[in-house]
Amino acid sequence: MAAKIKKGDTVIMIAGKDKGTKGEVLKVIPDESRVVVRGVNMVKRHQKPSQTDPGGLKSFEAPVHVSNVAIADPRDGKAVRVGFKIDQHGRKTRFAKRSGESIDV
């Protein structure tokens, strides 16, 4: 299946405790169908001290399932479904189904 969400995309949380929050995709985990989004699903973990880091309680972004996020429309920033089409150069590109705006730049 083609990747509808890629690293660097702006997404909106559509379910869960962070519903409505926008963020940038930091990491995609395709084997688990999960993504890590900046500032979303924050968890606290105890970090062991190292030579460069004092350790203690640290906040990290935990992965969320891709079904709980939607791509933000480049035109108005609302949640939108993603489609694929072949451009004039023969490349497969993503576009927002609601506005027709291209997501890939």
UniProtKB/Swiss-Prot annotation:
One of its GO terms (molecular function) is rRNA binding. InterPro entries: KOW, Rib_uL2_dom2, Ribosomal_uL24, Ribosomal_uL24_KOW, Translation_prot_SH3-like_sf. Gene3D superfamilies: 2.30.30.30. GO terms for cellular component: ribonucleoprotein complex; ribosome. Keywords: Ribonucleoprotein, Ribosomal protein, RNA-binding, rRNA-binding. SUPFAM superfamilies: Translation proteins SH3-like domain. SMART domains: KOW. GO terms for biological process: translation. Part of the 50S ribosomal subunit. One of two assembly initiator proteins, it binds directly to the 5'-end of the 23S rRNA, where it nucleates assembly of the 50S subunit. Belongs to the universal ribosomal protein uL24 family. This is Large ribosomal subunit protein uL24. It comes from Hyphomonas neptunium (strain ATCC 15444). The gene is rplX.
